[in-house]
Design a protein with these regions (language model features):
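Terminal intrinsically disordered/low-complexity segments used for targeting and assembly
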Residues: 2, 23, 28-87, 145, ...
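Glycine-biased, low-complexity coil/linker segments
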Residues: 10-11
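Sec/SRP-type N-terminal targeting helices
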Residues: 93-94, 110-111, 155-183, 233, ...
Length: 408
């Protein structure tokens, strides 16, 4: 029911008992929210790591600051390269843009809680047919002037808006975890490539020293052969040894160039304009403390992102189910309307309207049911993805623990 008025108001509208009752009902219903409340899905977790030794299980702590972990290696060149990843790595920049988009979606979903306010000003000229029946404007050209403000607000009776905010917030948290995962992945890949490159530097230097030694040995063997104190087979053997070592040195150089190119891409630089001078490692590799808990798994941002996507999908079920219930809105409009410019913004030209509206879809050919089933299927898929991420995380921890145990 909408109440309207064209003449000027001369007093307040008396409160009606029915109106207060309706307002109380709206307030009470605003505390409801359809759809399932979120609970983190169970994931199969072993009571202990197979390769754990002194390691232990721990709780997720992906929100902890990892700090500049690469600085423990004490390599200034590595430090500079990793710092550049944050600025120039394209995968990190893309993840950061997606996170900003997710935060904007949160702001957009929260805006639905508040009323809207729109302004409209128009001046139109119109002419009615000369033969029109009734009215005094037949055949005349009329100029209508209007200036108004309109406002609308939707009462979140069934929690549709709240579930939408829950979904967008969880998606933004997943975006933050994705950004952390992109940073960690790029930093880890760069560090791994860098240490492989430095290992190849040492290997290449050793091979070059061997090539020089084998070349001297070949010259000596040839001289001995010319003097008749060495057999031809000794010369052939020395030549084969030199050629084999030369081939290894060339292959090592190719591998080093490929790693250098990979590092260039990670820091967002064209390979043609990027190079790393050969050098030895700045320090020995740090040792992992034997009593360190399994933080490798508990702080993984990819698992946190998968879990947050489950929460977002769960909230979308509530959004879909809220469509089964009617929507309740309040709308109000007021302003000035006149055919005479001199009377436009005067009291007799004022108008207003205010009232609630209730809307309910009666028939949609199964659309709402299909949307609900889609939301449930999306939730089931994210649960499976979360559990798979947990399993993959445990596999990687077990693999690294096994490698650490074998090398100790």
């Amino acid at each position: 029911m909408t109440r309207t008025s064209s003449p000027p108001c001369r007093g307040g509208v008396p409160a009606q008992p029915a109106g207060w009752c309706a307002l109380a009902i709206v307030v009470m219903l605003a505390g409801c929210a359809v759809g399932p409340d979120y609970n983190r899905p169970d994931a199969e977790v072993a009571p202990a790591y197979k390769e754990a030794g002194e390691w232990k299980l721990a709780q997720p702590r992906d929100d902890l600051d990892r700090g500049k972990w690469w600085q423990v290696f004490g390599d200034p060149r590595l430090n500079a390269l990793v710092e550049q990843v944050e600025i120039s790595n394209q995968n990190v920049l893309a993840a950061e843009a997606r996170f900003r988009r997710a935060r904007a979606l949160v702001a957009g979903s929260r805006a639905a809680f508040f009323p809207t306010l729109d302004a409209d000003v128009s001046v139109t000229r119109s002419r009615s047919p000369a033969g029109a029946i009734g009215g005094t404007t037949a055949g005349r050209v009329i100029t209508n002037r209007s200036a108004s403000l309109s406002s609308g607000w939707e009462a979140d009776l069934w929690g549709r808006l709240r579930r939408a905010v829950e979904s967008s917030e969880a998606s933004a948290q997943a975006g933050a975890a994705d950004l952390a995962a992109a940073r960690l992945s790029a930093q880890g890949e760069l560090a791994s490539n860098y240490f492989q490159l430095r290992a190849l530097d040492a290997q290449k230097q050793l091979l070059e020293d061997n090539v020089a030694a084998f070349r001297r040995s070949l010259d000596l063997t040839k001289n001995r052969y010319d003097a008749g104190v060495a057999a031809k087979v000794d010369v052939v053997q020395a030549e084969t040894q030199l050629k084999s070592t030369l081939a290894q040195a060339i292959d090592t150089g190719v591998q080093r160039a490929q790693l250098e190119h990979a590092i260039a891409i990670l820091v967002g630089t064209p390979p043609a304009s990027f190079s790393i001078a050969p050098a030895t490692l700045a320090s020995a590799m740090p040792q992992i403390p034997p009593a360190l808990p399994s933080e490798l798994l508990e702080r993984r941002p990819d698992i946190a992102a998968a879990e947050r996507r489950v929460a977002a999908a769960n909230a979308e079920i509530g959004v879909a189910k809220a469509a089964y219930f009617p929507s309740f809105t309040l709308a109000a409009t007021g302003g000035f309307r006149s055919a005479e410019a001199s009377q436009w913004f005067t009291a007799p030209s004022r108008f207003w309207s205010i009232g609630p509206a209730l809307a309910q879809s009666i028939f949609d050919a199964g659309l709402r049911r299909a949307q609900t089933e889609q939301a449930i299927a999306d939730y089931d898929a994210t649960v499976a993805g979360y559990r798979q991420a947990v399993l993959a995380g445990f596999q990687e921890v077990e693999d690294n623990l096994a490698a650490r145990t074998a090398s100790s």
